[in-house]
């Protein structure tokens, strides 16, 4: 996870890896309810840059660049968090 402050601290650019048990893994862009204030800029997968569309699916190990308003960082952290599985 890397992040960079932009716009005099009003926003951040965050690069994060999609883990196998992340809430985003194997999800289609159109099925993700991104909060207002968070946008996906690009995905780095298998040595290629992908500009996501509504049909893009997040894969394990994708490196994703997010743009977020500072006030939305907590919501983004929740999206990137690990899903708990109970048996």
Features from the language model and the residues they span:
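Long, charged amphipathic helices and adjacent flexible linkers at domain junctions
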Residues: 1-15, 86-87
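Cytosolic Rossmann-like ligand/nucleotide-binding regulatory domains
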Residues: 14-82, 87
């Amino acid at each position: 996870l890397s992040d960079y402050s932009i716009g005099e601290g009003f926003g951040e650019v965050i690069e994060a890896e999609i883990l196998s048990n992340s809430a985003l893994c194997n999800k289609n862009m159109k099925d993700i309810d991104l909060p207002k204030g968070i946008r996906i800029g690009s995905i780095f997968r298998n040595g290629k840059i992908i500009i996501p569309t509504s049909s893009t699916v997040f894969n394990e190990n994708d490196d994703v660049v997010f743009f977020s308003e500072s006030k939305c960082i907590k919501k983004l952290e929740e999206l990137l968090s690990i899903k708990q599985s109970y048996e």
